[in-house]
């Protein structure tokens, strides 16, 4: 492992944001671009699709591999 002292990061124990930065950062959750939300929804929809030939009652598996 190579150590690069110029890449070291100081971690402060103070809560973030501190008093100096309070006016610069929005309160609450940061806004998320609509493109990210749309992509996340597409991934969720694709993950919820059941494969063809499978039953929802059992775990999805490859239906064309049969033991002989």
From Swiss-Prot:
Coiled coil feature spans: none
Keywords: Cytoplasm, Phosphoprotein
Region (Disordered): 21-54
Pfam family, one: Alveol-reg_P311
Compositional bias annotation for Polar residues: 44-54
InterPro entries: Neuronal_3.1 (IPR024417)
Major subcellular location class: cytoplasm
Location within or outside the cell: Cytoplasm
GO CC entries: cytoplasm
Domain of life: Eukaryota
Maturation and modification: Phosphorylated on Ser-59. Phosphorylation decreases stability and activity.
One GO-annotated biological process of the protein: regulation of transforming growth factor beta receptor signaling pathway
Subunit structure: Interacts with the latency-associated peptides (LAP) of TGFB1 and TGFB2; the interaction results in a decrease in TGFB autoinduction. Interacts with FLNA.
Function: May have roles in neural function and cellular differentiation. Ectopic expression promotes axonal regeneration, induces differentiation of fibroblast into myofibroblast, induces myofibroblast ameboid migration, augments motility of gliomas, and increases retinoic-acid regulation of lipid-droplet biogenesis. Down-regulates the expression of TGFB1 and TGFB2 but not of TGFB3. May play a role in the regulation of alveolar generation.
Protein name stated in the entry: Neuronal regeneration-related protein
Species of the source: Pongo abelii (Sumatran orangutan)
Taxonomy of the source species: Eukaryota, Metazoa, Chordata, Craniata, Vertebrata
Name of encoding gene: NREP
């Amino acid at each position: 492992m190579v150590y690069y002292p110029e890449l070291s990061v100081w971690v402060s124990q103070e809560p973030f944001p501190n008093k100096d930065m309070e006016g610069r950062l929005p309160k609450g959750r940061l806004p998320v671009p609509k493109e990210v939300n749309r992509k996340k929804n597409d991934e969720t929809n694709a993950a919820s699709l059941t494969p063809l030939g499978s039953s929802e009652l059992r775990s999805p598996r490859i239906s064309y591999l049969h033991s002989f």
